[in-house]
Structure formats: C-alpha cells, structure tokens
C-alpha cells in the first residue's frame, strides 16, 4: 500500500509541476515504475517454453525501464529459489507459512511449478550460479552473462519439447 501511495504522490507532483489538467494512462506509465515481479514471472515462463527471443525482449524491457541488472539478476535468482521451495512443499499454505511468501505470489508460484520438473528448476538454479560466478570472477560482463543464461536455458528447454 505504501508503494501505491508513493507512486500516486509522484504522479500528482508531476501533474502539478507540468501544469497538466488531468491524469491519463500514458502519464502514469511515464512517471511510475513498473512492477518487476510480474516481468520476472514472464521471463521464467518464456525460458520454460524455450522462447529465448521472448526472454531477451523481456530483459530489454526491464533494462529500458531503468531496472538495474543486478536487481533483475537477484529477482530472477530469488524467483528460481521460490519455485524450488514451491515444488518441494507442493502446498500453497505451507509455502506462505514456511517460506514467508505473499499469498498472491504463492498462488502464482504454485501455478508456475505445474509446467516445471524439479530437475528443470535445479538446472536453472545451477545456470544462475554459473552466470553469477562468471561475473564475480571477471570472466564475463554482467549483461552478456545474464543474456547467455537466458539463451542457454531457453534452448535447453526448447530441445526437451
């Protein structure tokens, strides 16, 4: 609720300073920061369906919206960990209680795990680790490493279909 209040405050300040007479959807999209969580769900879905091009498009949207790549990487890694927890627990209530995940996110995670096997999630987690390691060791630039992660994972899933 606090985040919504802050975003509304930004829109109101923008309207006042730009001397606009009203608020429209374009103005909200211009001023407000999009929700990264929804994009991370979509990014994971694109990978699981073997759609590298879609995964890269979603990454570019996040980057164009000025989301920092380390945050995107962190959110993606966290999402994979949450999917592993969801797969292990197999119960929305347990996921909410034990992993302390918001009920809406838990519901979406439970839906997303239906199309993924535990071995798929372990593969993704390992790819996240390797990508992060390459960056920290200076073997690869951050963006290239993450794009490679998306492409390699997507192609692996595409070849399984």
Please place each PLM-identified region on the residue numbering.
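Short alpha-helical scaffolding segments that buttress acidic/His motifs in well-ordered protein cores
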Residues: 8, 76, 125-128, 150
């Amino acid at each position: 609720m606090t985040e919504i209040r802050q975003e509304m405050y930004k829109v109101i300040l923008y309207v006042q300073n730009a001397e606009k007479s009203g608020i429209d959807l374009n103005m909200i999209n211009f001023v407000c920061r999009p929700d990264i969580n929804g994009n991370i769900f979509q990014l994971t879905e694109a990978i699981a369906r073997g759609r590298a091009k879609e995964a890269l498009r979603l990454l570019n949207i996040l980057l164009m919206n000025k989301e920092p790549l380390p945050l995107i990487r962190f959110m993606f890694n966290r999402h994979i960990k949450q999917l592993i927890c969801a797969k292990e627990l197999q119960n929305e209530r347990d996921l909410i209680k034990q992993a302390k995940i918001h009920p809406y996110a838990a519901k979406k995670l439970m839906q997303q795990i239906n199309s993924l096997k535990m071995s798929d999630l372990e593969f993704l987690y390992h790819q996240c680790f390797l990508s992060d390691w390459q960056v920290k060791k200076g073997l690869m630039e951050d963006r290239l490493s993450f794009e490679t992660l998306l492409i390699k994972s997507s192609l692996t899933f595409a070849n399984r279909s």
